[in-house]
Amino acid sequence: SMPKFNKENILVEVYNLILDSETTDTERKELVIFKDEVEKGLDFDNALMKLADHLRLIGLDNVLKHRSMSKKVNKFYMKINSVGQFKKNFGIYFPPMF
């Protein structure tokens, strides 16, 4: 079933990534936007989905520029990544058919 993420745990993780010196400015910008939106009371799942999508775009851009995502942000992205793709496409999670 859909991974359900704990809001407080995710926020703590995001705060730590924002403060981490290895986090790039581009990554940090997206993390700060997410943090601000959640603190303003925006829907957590939607904000997380948007963050996953934006980190995915950063990842694709990095590939084109032969850069890599900072290690901890990449690990965090891998964890939340599943939420964006499935929820957006179907509203519910369907396991891949292959």
Task: Indicate residue ranges for each PLM-predicted region.
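Intrinsic-disorder/low-complexity, polar/charged segments
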Residues: 40-44, 95-98
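Non-catalytic, well-ordered alpha-helical scaffold segments
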Residues: 8, 12, 28-32, 45-49, ...
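Amphipathic alpha-helical binding modules
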Residues: 64-98
